Amino acid sequence: MKTSQTGISLIKRFEGCRLETYRCSAGALTIGYGHTGSDVKPGMMITQAQAEAYLAADLKRFERAVDKTRLDLTQRSFDALVSFAYNCGVGNLSKLCKKGRTQWEIAAKILTYNRAGGKVIDGLTRRRKEEAELFKSGIKSDHEVALEVLDDLWGKGTVRRNRLIDAGYSYGNVQKAVNAILLDDGK
């Protein structure tokens, strides 16, 4: 999946664009739309086009990282996690999306990543809130997933259970929704 314009706009709005190097709140040398790395040098200046190119390259790296989470994501949830990874890094993305955590738990946990240098940062708090809201707005309901289960899109038995858990769903809740649909159809 690729980041939509909604996700790109979110990242650009919170990162801002600076064409000269600066130190971010975590102390890293930064340029453009929050680009960091060994290629960023003190006193460096870039053009707007270079800032856009850095952003595009960085997005690809974070999109791959979000894809590796193996979560069953809608575009909105994907965009939220790319923004999160862009700002917090791949290591924190892995911690956030650890195996067994449901998508609702992930949405709640996003809010806790609002510190830099051990201090709560208002801008990070606002960003995490927007990312959490965007993420939640994309989570499929248990009923939607149950309909996919009934269409055999998730496999059978233990395979289905493991796939649902790996994708960030509560197996018990989805199974209850499946049973409710089956009971309703039996009336």
Language model regions located:
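Long, amphipathic alpha-helical surface segments
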Residues: M1-E20, A26, H35, V40, ...
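Short alpha-helical scaffolding segments that buttress acidic/His motifs in well-ordered protein cores
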Residues: I11, F78-A85, K109-I110, V149
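Short hydrophobic-aromatic micro-motifs
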Residues: T30-G32
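Active-site nucleophile-His-acid catalytic modules used for acyl/amide transfer and hydrolysis
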Residues: K60-G91
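Repeat-associated, polar segments at repeat-unit boundaries in modular proteins
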Residues: R128, A132-I139, A167-K187
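Extracytoplasmic Gram-positive cell-surface binding/anchoring modules and repeats
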Residues: D142, D151-R161, Y171
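General marker for long, soluble alpha-helical cores
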Residues: V145-E148, L153, V178-D185
